[in-house]
């Protein structure tokens, strides 16, 4: 297990603690649709409040690319934080400069201040030294409780630990503990389900898991790459042609490692002109219309995957298998969620899921509490699965010593 300085190792009373959270949560029309990532960080915030810290929360929302976009203001999460903490949460409309400095000077021990979206400043994603210096000047101690952002070499993830006494929050430690334990002791058959639309990084994941997994179930836009490789006509379905050759190499590698790659063999498609929805077989004779897209896996594919779930001892899931946000394209993710949950409840399956969309899909199915472990990480979860050291975790490891900060 990775050793990191914990909150109990740091004296925070009357100190300004810069607390990095991941408040990049799904919203529709300014309303939060899934507060999981906030809920999981509440114990860390409450600990800091109880121990007399001045808690300054920093985070990002969306990808404004260094520009101010009011629709991506973190002001939208203040009410949710207040409801979960049952205290007043102050908001600062800037993240660096005199405005947050003056707001922090007025803070009392046990109070909470949320700064504006860090990504409104380009220095955050660039890990710019000037931005790091300005941000670090606001606090006395840095705490990282954003596991889901710890794969990024950004200012608030890697820059701040180099400037301030640093520690890991409860959520970050919990993620590392659970994921390390699960993957170091994975019982077989070991099944991995990979879906979603982020294709490039997930192909790397597939390539690394071929030697570990017994079954690799590929769905969503990821599967479209393999279907295109087989020269299936998939209409306007999302995929990246430049990744087809990589998919071919992965299939060949899987053959030599006895890893079975499972692709959809039927699908739910939608014609975007007529809005007609049909179920089709995926084969070499398929001719999809140019304005039609694959939106979900079909019933035969669902049945096949459920059969694999029934014989699996460990399952890792990242990425929905269809466009679950839109009815009726949630069927695949819902059926798989319920099948995994049902077997997990018997005690014969260890089930792990990670990624914002995956969490939302499982939550929508009503069975999220039945999974063995739900990781808040998306990209961080994927990199951890590949055995990579996360930059944010490495930055904390470099600050490890036995001294307490007073």
Curated annotation (Swiss-Prot):
Which reactions does this protein catalyse? (2R)-3-phosphoglycerate + ATP = (2R)-3-phospho-glyceroyl phosphate + ADP
**Which example biological process does GO assign this protein?**
glycolytic process
Compartment(s) where it occurs, according to its Swiss-Prot or TrEMBL record: Cytoplasm
**Residues binding substrate, per UniProt:** 22-24, 37, 60-63, 119, 152
Going by the UniProt record, its keywords in alphabetical order are:
ATP-binding, Cytoplasm, Glycolysis, Kinase, Nucleotide-binding, Transferase
GO MF annotation terms: ADP binding; ATP binding; phosphoglycerate kinase activity
The record describes its quaternary structure and partners as:
Monomer.
Protein name per the record: Phosphoglycerate kinase
Q: Gene encoding it?
A: pgk
């Amino acid at each position: 297990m990775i050793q990191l300085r914990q909150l109990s190792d740091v004296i925070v009373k009357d100190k300004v603690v810069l607390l990095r959270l991941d408040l990049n949560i799904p919203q529709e029309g300014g309303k939060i649709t899934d507060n999981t990532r906030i809920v999981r960080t509440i114990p860390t915030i409450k600990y800091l409040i109880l121990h007399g810290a001045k808690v300054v929360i920093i985070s990002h929302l969306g990808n404004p690319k260094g520009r101010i976009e009011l629709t991506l203001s973190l002001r939208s999460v203040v009410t949710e934080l207040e409801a979960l903490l049952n205290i007043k949460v102050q908001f600062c409309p800037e993240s660096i400069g005199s405005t947050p400095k003056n707001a922090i000077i007025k803070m009392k021990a046990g109070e909470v201040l949320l700064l504006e979206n860090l990504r409104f400043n380009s220095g955050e994603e660039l890990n710019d030294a000037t931005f790091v210096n300005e941000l670090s000047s606001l606090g006395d101690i840095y705490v990282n409780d954003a596991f889901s952002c710890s794969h990024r070499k950004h200012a608030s993830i890697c820059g701040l630990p180099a400037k301030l006494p640093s520690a890991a929050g409860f959520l970050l430690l919990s993620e590392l503990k659970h994921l390390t334990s699960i993957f170091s002791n994975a019982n077989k058959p070991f099944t991995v389900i990979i879906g979603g639309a982020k294709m490039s990084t997930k192909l790397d994941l597939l390539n690394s898991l071929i030697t570990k997994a017994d079954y690799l179930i590929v769905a969503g836009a990821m599967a479209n790459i393999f279907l295109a490789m087989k020269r299936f006509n998939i209409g306007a379905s999302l995929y990246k042609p430049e990744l087809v050759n990589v998919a071919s190499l992965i299939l060949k590698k899987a053959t030599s490692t006895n890893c079975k790659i499972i692709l959809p063999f039927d699908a739910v498609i939608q014609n975007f002109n007529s809005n007609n929805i049909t179920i089709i077989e995926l084969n070499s004779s398929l001719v999809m219309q140019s304005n039609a897209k694959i939106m979900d896996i079909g019933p035969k594919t669902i049945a096949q995957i459920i059969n694999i779930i029934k014989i699996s001892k460990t399952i890792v899931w990242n990425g929905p298998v269809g466009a679950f946000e839109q009815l009726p394209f949630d069927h695949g993710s819902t059926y798989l969620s319920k099948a995994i949950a049902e077997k997990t409840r018997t005690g014969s399956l260890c089930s792990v899921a990670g990624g914002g969309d995956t969490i939302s899909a499982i939550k929508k199915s009503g069975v999220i509490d039945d999974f063995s472990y739900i990781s808040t990480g998306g990209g961080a979860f994927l990199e951890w699965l590949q055995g990579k050291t996360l930059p944010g975790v490495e930055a904390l490891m470099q600050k490890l010593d036995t001294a307490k900060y007073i």
